[in-house]
A protein has these predicted regions:
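N-terminal Rossmann-like NAD(P) cofactor-binding subdomain of oxidoreductases
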Residues: 1-179, 197-199, 267-269
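C-terminal active-site/capping subdomain that shapes the small-molecule cofactor and substrate pocket
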Residues: 220-311
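Contiguous C-terminal substrate-recognition/catalytic subdomains in enzyme active sites
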Residues: 62, 172-261
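Predominant activation on well-ordered alpha-helical scaffold segments within soluble catalytic domains
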Residues: 18, 143-147, 184-188, 192, ...
Length: 311
C-alpha cells in the first residue's frame, strides 16, 4: 500500500483529495496535517466525510514514514514555507497544489519538479519524478484546449480566453480577471515547451459563476486551418489519454461535475477557431489530477480511484 499524507488538511482541495483516496484501493491515508484543527475529526471540517472516516487532524507530519505527500494548501508561499521547515527524505514523492514552484518546474532545467499537467508530461512522471507541481484550475482547462495547436506550431495570433468558474465568495457574474490573469505565466511556459516561437498576446475575461464546482471556458483565435484538420490534430494528441475527450457537441458542466474529465469541443466560423472546454475545477483542476499524477508516479493504471462514481 502507498502511505499518503496531506498537508493543508482543512482546505477544499484536501477535502476532495480525501474523498478520492478513501476509496483508492492502493492507498492508506496515514496523516492529515492541520495544526489549526489538531484533534478534530476530519468530518467536523469536511462534512461530506461523515461516516466515511474517523481520522483526526494532527499537527504532526511523519515525513520519514510516508511514500507520498499531497501539499493541499494553495495559498502562495505555503509550500515554500513547508519545504523550508522540513527535511524531506530522498525518494519521497511530493504533489504540490500551490503555485509556488509552477514556473520553476517549467523554466528551470535544474528543478527537481515536473509541471504536472498529465497530458503532455506523462513520461517524466512515470520515469522517476519525485516532485510534481500541479497546474492552476484555469491552466488545467486552457492548456488542453491549446496544446495540440502548440504542438503543431499553430499558435500565431491573439488568443482570447473567456471563462466562468466557481467562486463561492463572489457574486455570479462578478469579474475575477480582466485582460491579465495570475496563471498567465504558467500557461505561456507550458505552451512554449511545445512551440518555442509562441509569443502571442493572451487576453483573459474570467467571471464568477453561480455554482460550487466547475469551470467553462471559450478560447478563440484566428486560424486558417480547417476545423476538420484541427479535429484530427486534437484526436491524435489525446488518443491515449483517458480523461481528456474531444466531443461533437458543446460540453456542459453537468457532464464533468465530480469527475476528472476535460471535455473539448471545436468549431470554426472563419476566420475564427472557437474552442469550448469544461472541467470540474475542484477535481480535474486540482484533486483529481493530483491523484492521477500519483498513479503515474507509482506506476499504477492511471484511472485507478478515478472511475465515474454513482451519486
Amino acid at each position: 500500500m502507498i502511505k499518503a499524507a496531506i498537508s493543508g488538511g482543512t482546505t477544499p482541495q484536501a477535502r476532495e483529495i480525501l474523498k478520492i483516496l478513501i476509496n483508492h484501493p492502493d492507498v492508506e491515508i496515514v496523516c492529515v496535517n492541520a495544526p489549526e484543527a489538531e484533534g478534530m475529526l476530519l468530518s467536523q471540517v469536511h462534512r461530506g466525510l461523515r461516516g466515511e472516516t474517523f481520522m483526526r487532524f494532527t499537527s504532526q507530519m511523519p515525513i520519514d514514514d510516508i511514500d507520498v505527500l499531497f501539499m493541499a494548501d494553495t495559498e502562495p508561499g505555503a509550500s515554500m514555507k513547508f519545504m523550508a521547515t522540513h527535511s524531506v527524505p530522498e525518494g519521497l514523492k511530493i504533489i504540490d497544489l500551490s503555485p509556488d514552484f509552477r514556473e520553476e518546474s517549467l523554466n528551470d532545467a535544474e528543478s527537481p519538479g515536473v509541471y504536472a499537467l498529465p497530458e503532455p508530461h506523462r513520461k517524466p512522471l512515470v520515469r522517476g519524478a519525485t516532485r510534481a507541481s500541479m497546474p492552476g484550475p484555469l491552466a488545467s482547462a486552457v492548456l488542453p484546449a491549446l496544446l495540440p495547436l502548440a504542438k503543431n506550431l499553430l499558435l500565431n495570433s491573439t488568443i482570447h480566453i473567456n471563462a466562468v468558474q466557481a467562486e463561492p465568495q463572489a457574486e455570479p457574474g462578478e469579474p475575477l480577471a480582466l485582460l491579465e490573469h495570475e496563471e498567465d505565466a504558467e500557461i505561456r511556459g507550458a505552451l512554449g515547451t511545445l512551440q518555442a516561437s509562441f509569443h502571442s498576446e493572451m487576453l483573459y475575461v474570467v467571471t464568477a459563476g453561480g455554482w460550487q464546482n466547475g469551470l467553462a471556458a471559450t478560447v478563440y483565435m484566428e486560424s486558417a486551418v480547417s476545423v476538420n484538420e484541427i479535429e484530427k490534430l486534437y484526436e491524435e494528441f489525446f488518443s491515449d489519454h483517458s480523461f481528456t475527450l474531444v466531443a461533437d457537441t458543446l460540453p456542459t458542466l453537468m457532464e464533468v461535475a465530480g469527475t476528472n474529465k476535460c471535455i473539448i469541443h471545436l468549431q470554426k466560423s472563419d476566420p475564427w477557431l472557437v474552442i469550448n472546454v469544461a472541467i470540474d475545477d475542484k477535481i480535474k483542476g486540482a484533486a483529481g489530477s493530483a491523484v492521477h499524477v500519483m498513479n503515474l508516479m507509482f506506476g499504477l493504471q492511471e484511472r485507478v480511484g478515478l472511475m465515474l462514481k454513482s451519486h
